[in-house]
Amino acid sequence: MNPNQKIITIGSVSLTIATICFLMQIAILVTTVTLHFKQYECDSPANNQVMPCEPIIIERNITEIVYLTNTTIEKEICPKLVEYRNWSKPQCKITGFAPFSKDNSIRLSAGGDIWVTREPYVSCDPGKCYQFALGQGTTLDNKHSNDTIHDRTPHRTLLMNELGVPFHLGTRQVCIAWSSSSCHDGKAWLHVCVTGYDKNATASFIYDGRLVDSIGSWSKNILRTQESECVCINGTCTVVMTDGSASERADTKILFIEEGKIVHISPLSGSAQHVEECSCYPRYPGVRCVCRDNWKGSNRPIVDINVKDYSIASSYVCSGLVGDTPRKNDRSSSSYCRNPNNEKGNHGVKGWAFDDGNDVWMGRTISEESRSGYETFKVIGGWSTPNSKLQINRQVIVDSDNRSGYSGIFSVEGKSCINRCFYVELIRGREQETRVWWTSNSIVVFCGTSGTYGTGSWPDGADINLMPI
């Protein structure tokens, strides 16, 4: 090869290499620009249009680092949309209940700073469960805990912690309240908080950490609400509120709330005579509540709420094994589905039940007269057959020698079904235990199971003689 040919060959090779390098630089530039703009866009599968990421509520923020030669590009993966809960899955089939959580608040109060509380409940967002209670504005080992048997003071606040975490000094005080309800609509928490004078109280509606709406007492006689979770379906949350006498006719209303704003109020209708402290659960497409009749019945009233047209129906649990306390013994008690049974109806305790086809699962104190012990069972035909009394799958949660208190339901959505869980308030201190001057509680929590289970008793467990006075 002569010198001219060598020069031509070397030049051709150099030109080829230069062309390849030029094309690679163009490819890198195009990729860089594309990824840079991609981090601000999401592809919407519904209509193939591009929409910005910023206004979308997100569950998590994931950043990937992509390396191209000497260039570092941060690419944000657009998160999935957070949607309202609709609770459309079926109810889980269960054989009974298994232990889930216990906070041991009273035992821990013997040596630590734990809030004095009552009226606890549990509610869950889509990822985690929380326990709530109405605090008395004091810890137990504190002279302010004297005489905390009283229900309504301006110092009471709604407390919120992860389930299983006792209410320590770092606990968040969500709002001022001596009566409350809370629920998560899939996007944010709604808290209904009642406080003020007995004859002119205020209910505040707090959504996503902001006060959105309020309503004043309509009967000027202790406006009050559920003391357990409310329920939200497709962005509409329902809460049952009562104002009026605790031992005669009262004025109950069902409030419909969207993102903290009251959008409709329906009066109670149907055959229920007195409704307080409802334990509510989603029963798609509506909401169902089992409540406390503090006037005429030891059988529990049912309130059915239609979220779409705001209509209300009410009746009573059919089971002749009734759920309130005090009550007649099981041989003598009765219920015929429509009306209160007029059996030891005056006074009562918050409780729960839920339908399982024609049957009913329910919990109640073991004692017929006092808030002692706690049991659960299923009554065959108890939802549809008047005065049905065939009991199966009985479990003791708290033995009859130990104190219980309020109880209520909460629902947990699984992959294929909705599970029902319940909590039991374990009251300690006054009035029964007069060695001390305070009244407070711990809780125990069980959830439905399709498996097998054993036996036991899960009382509060604190030795009152070791407790601060």
Curated annotation (Swiss-Prot):
Co-factor(s): Ca(2+)
Known regulation of activity: Inhibited by the neuraminidase inhibitors zanamivir (Relenza) and oseltamivir (Tamiflu). These drugs interfere with the release of progeny virus from infected cells and are effective against all influenza strains. Resistance to neuraminidase inhibitors is quite rare.
Annotated localization: Virion membrane; Host apical cell membrane
Protein name in the entry: Neuraminidase
Catalytic activity: Hydrolysis of alpha-(2->3)-, alpha-(2->6)-, alpha-(2->8)- glycosidic linkages of terminal sialic acid residues in oligosaccharides, glycoproteins, glycolipids, colominic acid and synthetic substrates
Location (main, coarse): virion
Additional remarks: The influenza A genome consist of 8 RNA segments. Genetic variation of hemagglutinin and/or neuraminidase genes results in the emergence of new influenza strains. The mechanism of variation can be the result of point mutations or the result of genetic reassortment between segments of two different strains.
Keyword Metal-binding: yes
A GO BP entry: viral budding from plasma membrane
Single GO cellular component term: host cell plasma membrane
Molecular-function GO term, any one: metal ion binding
Stretch list, region Hypervariable stalk region: 36-88
Organism: Influenza A virus (strain A/Texas/1/1977 H3N2)
Gene: NA
